[in-house]
C-alpha cells in the first residue's frame, strides 16, 4: 500500500518547530494506528509523556534531531543517548517490525529508524522524498497531514550530505497530543 488513507480514529500528534529561536510553524502528523497499532502507540506515548519509567515521564521532550539529510530524511527521537545509538520503547526494549504494508512512497511519511530487523524503539524519521529502497526494512506508521513546508524548512538547514543537530523542548499542547520544538545548529 502506497500511503494509508486518513482515518478519523487515528491519533494526531504535532511538533511545534522553531529554528534558531524563530518559530517556523507546526507539523501535524496522523499516526496509522489502524494499520500499525503497536508502533503508533509507542510513538504517541513518547509524544505525550504518558509512558513512565520509575514514575517519571520519558519521551521526546528534550530529545534531539541528530540527523538531517537533504532530499532524504530528518531523524530524531533518541532521548536515551541523543546521538542515534539509544533504544527505548513502551514495550521495555526493542520491538518487532509490525508489518511492511505501507511504503516510503512520498515526502512527509513517518517511519521507524532501526539498526536491523525487529530493532524498533524510540527513534523515527520523516521522509523528505520517495525512499522506496527502505520498503521492507523500516515500518511506516504516520504522515504529515499539515505542515509539510515546516519539514522542508528543517530539511534545508542541512547542506547536502551534512548533519544538523537539533534540540527539542516541550511546549504546551492544547488540543492534540505531542510536542516538539527544534533549534537547529550545524555540526561537522
Swiss-Prot record:
SUPFAM superfamilies associated with the record: Cyclophilin-like
Which UniProt key words apply to this protein? Answer: Acetylation, Chaperone, Cytoplasm, Isomerase, mRNA processing, mRNA splicing, Nucleus, Rotamase, Spliceosome
Q: Spell out the subcellular localization from the entry.
A: Nucleus speckle; Cytoplasm
- Record's InterPro entries? Cyclophilin-like_dom_sf, Cyclophilin-type_PPIase_CS, Cyclophilin-type_PPIase_dom
Q: Which residues form a coiled coil?
A: none
| The organism's place on the tree of life at top rank | Eukaryota
Catalytic function, reaction form: [protein]-peptidylproline (omega=180) = [protein]-peptidylproline (omega=0)
Q: Does the keyword Cytoplasm apply?
A: yes
The chain residues annotated with the modification N-acetylalanine are: 2
For this protein, the Enzyme Commission number is 5.2.1.8
GO BP annotations listed: mRNA processing; protein folding; RNA splicing
**What regulates the activity here?**
Inhibited by cyclosporin A.
Outline what the protein does: PPIase that catalyzes the cis-trans isomerization of proline imidic peptide bonds in oligopeptides and may therefore assist protein folding. Participates in pre-mRNA splicing. May play a role in the assembly of the U4/U5/U6 tri-snRNP complex, one of the building blocks of the spliceosome. May act as a chaperone.
Assembly and oligomerization: Interacts directly with PRPF4. Part of a heteromeric complex containing PPIH, PRPF3 and PRPF4 that is stable in the absence of RNA. Component of the U4/U6-U5 tri-snRNP complex composed of the U4, U6 and U5 snRNAs and at least PRPF3, PRPF4, PRPF6, PRPF8, PRPF31, SNRNP200, TXNL4A, SNRNP40, DDX23, CD2BP2, PPIH, SNU13, EFTUD2, SART1 and USP39. Heterodimer with PRPF18. Heterodimer with PRPF18.
Say which family it is in. Belongs to the cyclophilin-type PPIase family. PPIase H subfamily.
What is the protein's given name? Peptidyl-prolyl cis-trans isomerase H
Amino acid at each position: 500500500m502506497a500511503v494509508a488513507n486518513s482515518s478519523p480514529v487515528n491519533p494526531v500528534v504535532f511538533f511545534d518547530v522553531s529554528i534558531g529561536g524563530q518559530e517556523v510553524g507546526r507539523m501535524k502528523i496522523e499516526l496509522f494506528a489502524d494499520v500499525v497499532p503497536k508502533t503508533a502507540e509507542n510513538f504517541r506515548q513518547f509524544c505525550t509523556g504518558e509512558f513512565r519509567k520509575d514514575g517519571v515521564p520519558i519521551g521526546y521532550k528534550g530529545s534531539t534531531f541528530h540527523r538531517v539529510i537533504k532530499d532524504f530524511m530528518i531523524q530524531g527521537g533518541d532521548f536515551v543517548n541523543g546521538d542515534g545509538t539509544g533504544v527505548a520503547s513502551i514495550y521495555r526494549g526493542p520491538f518487532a517490525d509490525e508489518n511492511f504494508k505501507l511504503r516510503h512512497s512520498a515526502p512527509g511519511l513517518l517511519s521507524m529508524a532501526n539498526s536491523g530487523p525487529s530493532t524498533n524503539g524510540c527513534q523515527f524519521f520523516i521522509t523528505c522524498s520517495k525512499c522506496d529502497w527502505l520498503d521492507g526494512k523500516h515500518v511506516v506508521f504516520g504522515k504529515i497531514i499539515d505542515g509539510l513546508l515546516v519539514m522542508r524548512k528543517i530539511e534545508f538547514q542541512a547542506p547536502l550530505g551534512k548533519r544538523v543537530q537539533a534540540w527539542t523542548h516541550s511546549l504546551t499542547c492544547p488540543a492534540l497530543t505531542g510536542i516538539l520544538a527544534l533549534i537547529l545548529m550545524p555540526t561537522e
